[in-house]
Curated annotation (Swiss-Prot):
Superkingdom of origin: Eukaryota
Cellular component terms (Gene Ontology): peroxisome
The name this protein goes by in its record: Uncharacterized protein YMR158C-A
Length: 45
């Protein structure tokens, strides 16, 4: 369970970095961020 949480956190960090570098893909990255957030909430609950 901790491993899954770590992977979700890594994906979240990667999405934020990609969003900063590629402004054109900002909508896609925001969608990815929402999905990662949902996964993290699901693991916490």
């Amino acid at each position: 369970m901790k491993m899954n949480y770590h992977l979700s956190t890594s994906s979240y960090t990667t999405s934020m970095l990609s969003c900063t570098v590629l402004d054109d893909d900002i909508r896609y990255e925001k969608l990815s961020w929402k999905l990662d957030e949902a996964e993290m909430q699901g693991l916490i609950m």
